[in-house]
């Protein structure tokens, strides 16, 4: 089974994946798999450009794939980690990104971009709001979904997170200026 651990940068994917690996799960990053299968196209502004369609066609991995593109690999299950954009902004500020890149990611989170893409590419999709959860709580939620726990799968079904409604009077703070 291919499980995507995905979400906007800063939602906790790498931290969760690292701990899951320590607990014995088979975990790889999208970049590791892209390197293995020769699917890295280029590098732009310090970011690796991956031929995701080619990787999805070539992937032979069973386990958890971590990365904000992992949901595009046609996984059996996609677990989308989410975070309130107001909190996410603070998490991302330490990355020394340009204001444009910061806002691009906040906008993507606000508009459910990764969730919508996951719904298009994965057989099953779950979303976890990591905003006020400890790392251990997020890991427990992810493990429950992986185990097939019915309560967890019901609790984390997609559609329960709506940043636009929650932050409606602050939307402009998180959107790029046109």
Curated annotation (Swiss-Prot):
PANTHER family: ADENYLATE KINASE ISOENZYME 6, POS9-ACTIVATING FACTOR FAP7-RELATED. Residues 94-104 are annotated as: LID. The keyword Transmembrane does not apply. It is an enzyme of class 2 (transferase). Broad-specificity nucleoside monophosphate (NMP) kinase that catalyzes the reversible transfer of the terminal phosphate group between nucleoside triphosphates and monophosphates. Also has ATPase activity. Involved in the late maturation steps of the 30S ribosomal particles, specifically 16S rRNA maturation. While NMP activity is not required for ribosome maturation, ATPase activity is. Associates transiently with small ribosomal subunit protein uS11. ATP hydrolysis breaks the interaction with uS11. Interacts with uS11. Not a structural component of 40S pre-ribosomes, but transiently interacts with them by binding to uS11. ATP binds at residues 10, 12-15, 95. Keywords: ATP-binding, Kinase, Nucleotide-binding, Ribosome biogenesis, rRNA processing, Transferase. This is Putative adenylate kinase. Residues 29-50 are annotated as: NMP. It holds the Pfam family AAA_18. Its EC number is 2.7.4.3. GO terms for biological process: ribosomal small subunit biogenesis; rRNA processing. One of its GO terms (molecular function) is ATP binding. Belongs to the adenylate kinase family. AK6 subfamily. It catalyses: AMP + ATP = 2 ADP; ATP + H2O = ADP + phosphate + H(+). It comes from the Archaea.
